[in-house]
């Protein structure tokens, strides 16, 4: 299937989604908000990839929401009715945009973002929903909505405050300043900084291969447990992992890879099964 704003390939268990509108700084046009969750949810449903890498062509990862959205009434919401019923309808419109990125967080496979140049506005909503983020040394990050008189509403605030120290989340949000890659790594937004796009993509793909080489059920379970633990107490997290393993731990599935590793052989793991609909959809 083809998409307007990105290309998608799958090889050796690694899905690679490349934003492909470099001439427009990979801005997010209306079709992006439909196509991204469609593509990610399809990967998650059919279990065709063990990991998803997201990168971008051109100088910038993404400049966020396309300018047409702001200049052609895209933020005005539904027409007709009183202010109150329009506001209620706009809430659903906003939540649909939020779902376009929440699908990354809810996907059965890990999602790795490789970022160069600008990651501003809606792109911050985008990358904070990914599992891990990597950047080139020229990359910068900005909650730019504040500078245009808007409170970011598609996911930045609830996720950013759980990724970096609260003081930095507040400073970035209040000032709309640019935080460059080295500082972003220092505060925990970025895992690693690379000298060039080529080095970054090679490095992220190497990490993706490591992930793809592990048991899909264990990796998917780890993602689920980390997401749950982030949003719950330690006691809740311990209880959930105990229930999870009580139902999904397979002794034979562990013994076989263990024995293969002991013999210096490459372990083989059972793939996740395709499903009609994932829990996050």
Sequence positions of predicted segments:
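Conserved CoA-thioester-binding segment of acyl-CoA-metabolizing enzymes
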Residues: 1-57
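Terminal peptide-recognition signature
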Residues: 17, 21, 36, 54, ...
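Charged catalytic carboxylate motif
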Residues: 31-35, 96, 103, 203, ...
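Glycine- (often His-adjacent) and acidic-residue-rich active-site loop
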Residues: 56-99, 149
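Short, active-site-adjacent cap segments at secondary-structure transitions
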Residues: 58-63, 120-121, 226
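Crotonase-fold acyl-CoA enzyme core
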Residues: 102-217
């Amino acid at each position: 299937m083809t998409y307007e704003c990105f290309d998608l390939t799958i090889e050796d268990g690694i899905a690679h989604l490349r934003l492909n509108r470099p001439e427009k700084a990979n801005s997010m046009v209306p079709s992006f908000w439909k196509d991204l969750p469609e593509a990610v949810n399809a990967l998650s449903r059919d279990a065709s990839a063990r990991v998803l890498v997201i990168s971008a062509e051109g100088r910038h990862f993404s400049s966020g929401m396309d300018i047409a959205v702001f200049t052609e009434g895209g933020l005005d919401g539904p027409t007709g009715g009183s202010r109150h019923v329009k506001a209620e309808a706009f809430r659903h419109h906003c939540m649909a945009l939020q779902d376009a990125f929440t699908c990354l967080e809810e996907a059965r496979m890990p999602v790795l973002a490789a970022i160069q140049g600008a990651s501003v506005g809606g792109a911050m909503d985008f990358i904070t929903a990914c599992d891990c983020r990597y950047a080139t040394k020229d990359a910068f990050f900005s909650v730019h909505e504040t500078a245009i008189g808007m409170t970011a509403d598609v996911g930045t605030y609830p996720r950013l405050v759980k990724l970096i120290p609260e003081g930095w989340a507040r400073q970035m949000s209040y000032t709309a300043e640019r935080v460059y890659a080295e500082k972003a790594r220092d505060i925990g937004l970025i895992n690693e900084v690379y000298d060039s796009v080529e080095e970054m993509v090679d490095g992220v793909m190497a990490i993706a291969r490591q992930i793809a080489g592990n048991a899909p059920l264990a990796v998917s379970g780890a993602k689920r447990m980390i997401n749950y633990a982030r949003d719950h107490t330690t006691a809740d997290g311990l209880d959930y992992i105990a229930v999870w393993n009580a139902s999904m731990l397979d002794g034979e599935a562990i013994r076989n890879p263990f024995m293969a590793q002991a013999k210096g052989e490459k372990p083989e793991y059972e793939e996740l099964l395709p499903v009609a609909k994932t829990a996050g959809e």
